[in-house]
A protein has these predicted regions:
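Glycoside hydrolase catalytic-domain context in secreted enzymes
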Residues: 1-539
Length: 539
């Protein structure tokens, strides 16, 4: 299996896939490649494709049918460019708000996560009965649950009891009922399961729990670069610290891993040597190869591994797909506060100051795990929707300029939030508060005495207590996707009535975050906005 990332056009993507398959066809056995993509929110690594909001935004819609439609679009766009495996859906339950990958989850409610993830699996795999020629392989992650992290820091899972573990396994049990084809283990293993081994070498996790107890017969696929990561981090395998590849390879085969992400070609000669020396059981390797080849046959890639480049160019990211994407972004908009200032009037003779670095940044709408995408930023969209009688001014991050411009503004829209990222959040794990220059921008705008609207983008539940006490309205947009700028502007000007509901609790302060249990949902003390909060116009 091969992982592809960051392709700058649909045509380049389709041509690349065909080139890969041509190379494979000319190899000794001519076995086609099963190409995967780390596409956790649409065909996100292809510029010009349908790049949806992250799952946290989709969770705010509470719309299972809409999530299904978006997953079907993603499936068909993957197939159109020749990619037949997605490293999603994300089944983690966001019980620790500091975790950097909260944005990829459907929030902290195990029931909502289970419902939405199951809908994605069925859509990706074109039905409930396993793979077929109209499917892509869904690789569900990160088993057995990566949402609980010690102080939010990746690779430190803290599931504390057998009862809590069962809660975090709930989406996996549901996915097994609809024949999920592939599952990816997490980097580390919760101590409740295994105190000695890295995830990909944990027999207790993968063989005893996933295979034997839960009955999973599909592909266990490691994340990319995990063998290297274990070597560099002096991880543990089979209860001993190891850095040599031999011990790691023996350990992962004994734990019944099928696919080694990103390192199979580099390690194939060593795998053969270890097998010939009797250190790796050939029957285990045969079983792993059988699972992967079986999936390729079920998908039909042996019969036709190639894609139609011309069709891909006209199909991927088409207007109909983007219309559904925009519908989802609209439904994700979550109005946290409104003292009556919203909706703003269109075509009003007024000066609107839009400020904050996130307002001019497309990546802050799309979020991580993405290539560069085109679209309207928040500032562009506000200018487009304000009307010809309005004057819209944008200032990114010069606090002195913002303070001066605010004096002549009638309305100030301040955009705050974390910039795009993948694993480690730019604001770190120690705070969820708006800090630094963005807080200075808020205070400069507030000093003008003019009406203020705060627009929040990002992937975690930020502490918005200052904004709640000092601004007139707060619109939470999450990472809404490539159509997010339009959805935000439409909501601000009343063309979209916000109906989104928070998919997790928003903390009031960091003390409540530090005092909560990282593996338990709904346990923040006195949250600023509770789970399920969200206003609409007229309320």
């Amino acid at each position: 299996m091969l992982l592809i990332r960051e392709l700058n056009s649909v045509e380049a993507a389709a041509v690349s896939m065909n080139t890969i398959q041509e190379y494979a066809e000319g190899s000794r056995l001519g076995v086609p490649v099963l190409v995967s993509m780390d596409s956790v929110h649409g065909l996100s690594y292809v510029s010009g494709a349908t790049v949806t909001g992250h799952n946290l935004a989709l969770a705010a819609t509470r719309d299972e049918d809409l999530v299904t439609r978006l997953a079907e679009i993603a499936r068909d766009e993957h197939i159109a460019i020749g990619v037949r495996m997605t490293l999603s859906p994300e089944a983690d339950i966001a019980s620790e708000p500091r975790w950097g990958r909260v944005m990829e989850t459907f929030g902290e409610d195990p029931d909502l996560v289970t419902k939405m993830v199951t809908a994605q699996v069925v859509a990706f795999q074109n039905g409930r009965d396993g793979l077929n020629t109209g499917a892509i392989v869904a690789c569900m992650k990160h088993f057995p649950g990566a949402g609980p992290q010690m102080e939010g820091k990746d690779t430190s899972p803290i599931i504390s009891s057998a009862e809590t573990l069962q809660i975090h396994l709930k989406p996996y049990y549901a996915a097994l009922e609809v024949n999920i084809a592939s599952i990816m283990p997490y980097y580390s293993v919760p101590l409740e399961l295994d105190m000695e081994n890295s995830a990909i070498g944990s027999k207790a996790t993968l063989q005893d729990l996933l295979r034997d107890e839960m009955g999973f017969e599909g592909i266990i696929q490691t994340d990319w670069g995990m063998i290297w990561a274990i070597q560099e981090g002096r991880g543990t395998m089979m209860g001993e610290e190891v850095s040599d590849e031999e011990a790691i390879l023996i350990g992962i085969t004994e734990s019944r891993v099928d696919g080694i992400g990103g390192e199979s070609i580099r390690l194939i000669d060593q795998m053969e040597e270890l097998t010939n020396a009797g250190k790796i059981d050939e029957d285990i390797l045969t079983a792993a190869a059988t699972r992967i080849v079986k999936a390729k046959f079920e998908l039909g890639v042996f019969e036709n591994p190639y894609c139609d480049v011309e069709y891909a160019v006209q199909f991927v990211g088409n207007e109909e797909h983007q219309a559904v994407n925009l519908e989802a972004a609209r439904k994700a908009m979550t109005l946290l506060k409104n003292d009556g200032i919203l909706p703003l009037k269109q075509n009003e003779k007024q000066t609107i100051l839009v400020c904050g670095p996130r307002a001019g940044d497309m990546d802050s709408l799309v979020g991580g795990w993405s290539s560069a995408q085109e679209g309207l930023t928040i500032a562009d969209a506000v200018a487009a929707y304000a009307g010809e009688n309005a004057t819209v001014i944008y200032e990114s991050d010069n606090v002195e300029s913002i303070a001066e411009l605010a004096k002549d503004a009638d309305i100030i829209i301040v955009s705050v939030g974390e910039p795009s990222y993948q694993h480690d959040p730019p604001w770190g794990y120690d705070t969820l508060e708006i800090t630094g220059s963005q807080q200075e921008i808020l205070e400069a705008a507030k000093a003008s005495g003019k009406p203020m609207v705060t627009v929040v983008t990002g992937g975690r539940p930020y502490i918005l207590t200052w904004c709640d006490e000092n601004t007139n309205a707060i619109l939470e947009a999450y990472y809404p996707g490539s159509q997010g700028g339009i959805a935000i502007a439409e909501t601000l000007f009343g063309l979209n009535n916000p109906t989104g509901k928070t998919p997790l609790q928003f903390p009031r302060d960091m003390d409540s975050v530090r005092n909560q249990e990282g593996d338990v949902s709904f346990d923040l003390e006195n949250p600023l906005y509770d789970y399920g909060w969200g206003l609409s116009y007229g309320e």
